[in-house]
Amino acid sequence: MALNKKGAKRRRKKVCAFCADKSSSIDYKDVNKLRKYVTERGKILPRRISGNCAKHQRELTLAIKRARNVALLPFTTD
């Protein structure tokens, strides 16, 4: 890998997991998949950390919010 100006390695661009796996859809009822994109404190992971594309990040955010409203996911942890 090439080094940047400060001598640190450049990070490899993450590939969107939903684009790579064409058959997977984002569903608010699939709690196990949604938990991967939520921190232990209950916050939704940003795109630059999760590696999702913009389209799937928007769908993922909507699905997480729906799951929270239906009480499948907690809003926060105790």
Curated annotation (Swiss-Prot):
<keyword id="KW-0699">rRNA-binding</keyword>
<keyword id="KW-0694">RNA-binding</keyword>
<protein>
    <recommendedName>
        <fullName>Small ribosomal subunit protein bS18</fullName>
    </recommendedName>
</protein>
<dbReference type="GO" id="GO:0003735">
    <property type="term" value="F:structural constituent of ribosome"/>
</dbReference>
<comment type="subunit">
    <text>Part of the 30S ribosomal subunit. Forms a tight heterodimer with protein bS6.</text>
</comment>
<dbReference type="GO" id="GO:0022627">
    <property type="term" value="C:cytosolic small ribosomal subunit"/>
</dbReference>
<dbReference type="GO" id="GO:0006412">
    <property type="term" value="P:translation"/>
</dbReference>
<dbReference type="InterPro" id="IPR018275">
    <property type="entry name" value="Ribosomal_bS18_CS"/>
</dbReference>
<comment type="function">
    <text>Binds as a heterodimer with protein bS6 to the central domain of the 16S rRNA, where it helps stabilize the platform of the 30S subunit.</text>
</comment>
<comment type="similarity">
    <text>Belongs to the bacterial ribosomal protein bS18 family.</text>
</comment>
<keyword id="KW-0687">Ribonucleoprotein</keyword>
<dbReference type="InterPro" id="IPR036870">
    <property type="entry name" value="Ribosomal_bS18_sf"/>
</dbReference>
<dbReference type="InterPro" id="IPR001648">
    <property type="entry name" value="Ribosomal_bS18"/>
</dbReference>
<dbReference type="GO" id="GO:0070181">
    <property type="term" value="F:small ribosomal subunit rRNA binding"/>
</dbReference>
<keyword id="KW-0689">Ribosomal protein</keyword>
<dbReference type="Pfam" id="PF01084">
    <property type="entry name" value="Ribosomal_S18"/>
</dbReference>
